Design a protein with these regions (language model features):
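ABC-family P-loop ATPase nucleotide-binding domain
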Residues: 1-35, 245-250
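ABC family nucleotide-binding domain
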Residues: 24-239, 243
Length: 250
């Protein structure tokens, strides 16, 4: 009766997010479902997920491969839409936003950090960090100043002119974090940020994320590694598309 147990757990965990509207939450999801149709079969990647995230939260979303955690991360990042349910971001209903509003959110309000870094191989660290500023039309002189400041904030001030193949894995991830920070977003989404790094470098990257949280950033990371999740202040566990546990560590 595992399904029934998970549904009961989901209903209990959703109590705080059951009422309509965003309240004081930075993020509120209410009864999110994501269903894919493959031939005659329906695959439910998310099954009625509801939770609130207050400002300045440090949250880890954990679960095994195929649990739905990356699908949920894509929803939070406005990269995908639910089959049903609602998502409020900064008090606004995401389903009512047009393409320009969504593009603005992805560029200005959310900073993305990916497992594979997603850096342009022929561009310098400085130019890679400038890219979000180029997309939103920031003037060149201000753009360079902001990109330099972001790289200095992740201790890469001396590597601005280096290309990705001239940097270590940890340095590449620092460039990716600087790129996520450059627009001063309210939320940083990190999808398996240490997945391609050794244990020592992983700890360095997590200490950097810890520091960014202490500076007031909302950090949401997806991971399957429990030692990485332990850096967060709150952990939501996903199993078979549902929340199986929502616990506060500190």
């Amino acid at each position: 009766m595992m399904v029934a147990t998970l549904v009961d757990n989901q209903n209990a965990l959703s109590g705080a997010a059951a009422k309509n509207g965003p309240g004081d939450a930075l993020i509120r999801t209410q009864n999110l479902w994501k269903t894919y149709v493959m031939g005659e079969e329906e695959i439910h990647a998310l099954r009625g997920v509801s939770f609130d995230i207050p400002p300045n939260e440090y949250l880890a979303i954990v679960g095994p491969s195929g649990s739905g955690k990356s699908t949920l991360m894509n929803m939070i990042g406005c990269l995908d839409t639910p089959t049903q349910g609602e998502y409020w971001l900064n008090g606004k209903l995401v389903s009512q936003m047009d393409d320009d509003e969504l593009a603005h959110i992805r560029n200005k309000e959310i900073g993305f950090v990916f497992q594979t870094f997603n850096l342009l191989p022929r561009a310098t660290a400085l130019h890679n960090v400038e890219l979000p500023l180029i997309y939103n039309g920031t003037p060149s002189s201000k753009r360079i100043e902001m990109a330099k400041h972001a790289l200095e904030s992740v201790e890469l001030g001396s590597r601005m002119g280096h290309k990705p193949n001239e940097l270590s894995g940890g340095q590449r991830q620092r460039v990716a974090i600087a790129r996520a920070l450059v627009n001063n977003p309210s939320i940083i989404l990190a999808d398996e940020p240490t997945g391609n790094l050794d244990s020592k470098t992983s700890e360095e990257i997590m200490l950097l994320l810890d520091h960014l949280h202490k500076q007031g950033n909302t950090i949401i990371l997806v991971t399957h590694e429990h030692d990485i999740a332990a850096h967060a202040h709150r952990v939501i566990s996903i199993l078979d598309g549902q929340i199986s546990k929502d616990e506060r560590l500190r």
